[in-house]
Amino acid sequence: MSSGRGSRIPEYWYGQVPVPPFMRFMEVIYAGAVSLRRLAYRRGWRRRYGVAVPVVVIGNLVAGGTGKTPLTIEIVARLREAGWTPGIASRGYGRRDPKTPRWIQPDTPIELAGDEPAMIAWKTGMRVRVDVDRSAAARALVAEGCDIVVCDDGLQHYRLMRDIEIEVIDGQRRYGNGHLLPAGPLREPMVRGRLCDFRVLNAGQYSDRPTSGFGPSDWQMRLHIDHAQSLQGSRRRSLDAFSGQRVHAVAGIAHPERFFSMLRQRGIGVVPHAFPDHHFYRAEDFTFGSRLPVLMTEKDAVKCRAFADDWFFSVPLRVELPTVFWTALFDRLERLVSC
């Protein structure tokens, strides 16, 4: 049984029950506000800010997680391999004192960093700037010598001018019932995704060609798990070592069941513990009543290192995308810098 502490998503968002009439009314108001805001930026009524280097924005249209951060980390790694010096801009959701801009290091206290920026800094070793104003974060990164800015989330942050937009779509939930907030999960209408340069479908069937049923700039991404890393020391174990065993599986992410399912597919007996997205852990959260290994996502692990023991393991995600996707992305970047 799950601990039942995961964040609650309205059942009508994903079609289990009809949308309440009042929410349909609120959706109309929200839709008008979204359209007016986008028009204000298009017409120049609200100012936009750019920087002198390419800006890549990775985001989604729905509220909640879709796999943006693992893709951000993989893109940053590929950029480094290609000789770029990327910097990462993020809002830093859930951190203390959220209006204060801050540089995030791998050892920045989690309550000051936010879990996703902390994980990005830990995994990439690159400069990470958190700021509610992504354009200010981008300027700070460029001032520190970054020659490309990758924005983790921020598709709706039109204040920051961008060169490449990548929409990430949940391969299972897609756009839910297709309604805008609060009647559905959409932050913007579905047609907004067609304006993005690339659309990445998380957890779709892998293919080395564009995704069937989408468009020529739509690609399928798979997330793989194959080992667990001890939070104390450098001990690494294959997930096969846990096959046939019971473990406490911990996930404080938007869709914890996805993580639990991935572990089950590896033959692991999962005792699930779902926590709210962005939950800040205490040692008391792990009083499970039985001494079993604890497997958790990397996003959770960065918040548990201070009190973890030898039984705590993080499970890294490995991103797989078609070779043609990377070729298309880097071709676009080369054209940008050669202009």
Curated annotation (Swiss-Prot):
Its EC number is 2.7.1.130. One of its GO terms (biological process) is lipopolysaccharide core region biosynthetic process. GO terms for molecular function: ATP binding; tetraacyldisaccharide 4'-kinase activity. Pfam families: LpxK. GO terms for cellular component: plasma membrane. It catalyses: a lipid A disaccharide + ATP = a lipid IVA + ADP + H(+). Belongs to the LpxK family. Transfers the gamma-phosphate of ATP to the 4'-position of a tetraacyldisaccharide 1-phosphate intermediate (termed DS-1-P) to form tetraacyldisaccharide 1,4'-bis-phosphate (lipid IVA). HAMAP family: LpxK. NCBIfam families: lpxK. This is Tetraacyldisaccharide 4'-kinase.
